[in-house]
């Protein structure tokens, strides 16, 4: 192993090499670190979107509710497919989960075959931004409907339902939080790709 000290010709003692003289880390090592961070982020993205999807589609709740014109309470279900906004949200989560899985596999392939990195990185960066737009818009749309379910809107006669369907609303809130986290991960991936191109 090479010594990190230089012998002084006058005294014969060794002097340590200054830190500035140490060689910089190899580009191959930094490439591996970047690819590993990218893969970890994409695995987190897949986990977040898949969990949000599962929570959303299992949010159904049935409660005995007094309906207008009916003398006795009747069972009424609250389901995600009652709202077009929630349906759009679920479809966006399906697409995002599938994309996260495919992009993770592509990133692993690029780690094993780095010669294709430049070509596929451009595609991944573009698709990351497209998925960010889709998922963020779906999250915002579903969040608006969820807020009405929580607070209601007396001016137009929309009653709040979260006081009755508490499990349904909790599940939707959890799914929205996970989707927001996934959107932030996509934003990080987009910024990461942009910075990687400049360096």
From Swiss-Prot:
Q: Where in the cell is it found?
A: Cell membrane
Q: In which tissues is it expressed?
A: Expressed in the root endodermis and flowers.
Under Pfam families, the record lists: CASP_dom (PF04535)
Report whether Disulfide bond shows up as a keyword of the record. no
**Region entry Disordered, spans:** 1-27
State the UniProt keywords alphabetically: Acetylation, Cell membrane, Membrane, Transmembrane, Transmembrane helix
- Extracellular topological domain residue ranges: 58-85, 151-171
Q: Which domain of life is it from?
A: Eukaryota
The answer to whether UniProt assigns keyword Lipid metabolism to this entry is no
Q: Which GO terms describe its cellular component?
A: plasma membrane
List the InterPro entries. CASP/CASPL (IPR006459), CASP_dom (IPR006702), CASPL (IPR044173)
Q: How does it sit in the membrane?
A: Multi-pass membrane protein
Where exactly are the transmembrane stretches of this chain?
37-57, 86-106, 130-150, 172-192
Instruction: Indicate the family of this protein.
Output: Belongs to the Casparian strip membrane proteins (CASP) family.
Q: How does it assemble?
A: Homodimer and heterodimers.
Protein name, UniProt field: CASP-like protein 1D2
Report the source organism: Arabidopsis thaliana (Mouse-ear cress)
């Amino acid at each position: 192993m090479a010594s990190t000290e230089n012998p002084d010709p006058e005294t014969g003692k060794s002097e340590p090499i200054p830190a500035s003289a140490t060689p910089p880390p190899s580009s191959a090592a930094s490439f591996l670190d970047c690819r590993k961070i990218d893969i970890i982020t994409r695995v987190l993205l897949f986990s977040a979107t898949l969990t949000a999807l599962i929570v959303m589609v299992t949010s159904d709740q049935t409660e005995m509710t007094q309906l207008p014109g009916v003398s006795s309470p009747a069972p009424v279900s609250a389901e995600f497919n009652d709202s077009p906004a929630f349906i759009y949200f679920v479809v966006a989560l399906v697409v995002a989960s599938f994309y996260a899985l495919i992009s993770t596999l592509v990133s692993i392939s690029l780690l094993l075959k780095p010669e294709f990195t430049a070509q596929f990185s451009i595609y991944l960066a573009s698709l990351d931004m497209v998925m960010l737009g889709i998922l963020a818009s779906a999250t915002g749309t579903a969040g608006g409907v969820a807020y009405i379910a929580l607070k209601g809107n007396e001016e137009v006669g929309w009653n709040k339902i979260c006081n009755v369907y508490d499990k349904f609303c909790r599940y939707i809130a959890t799914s929205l939080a996970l989707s927001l986290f996934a959107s932030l991960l996509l934003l990080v991936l987009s910024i990461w790709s942009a910075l990687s191109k400049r360096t």
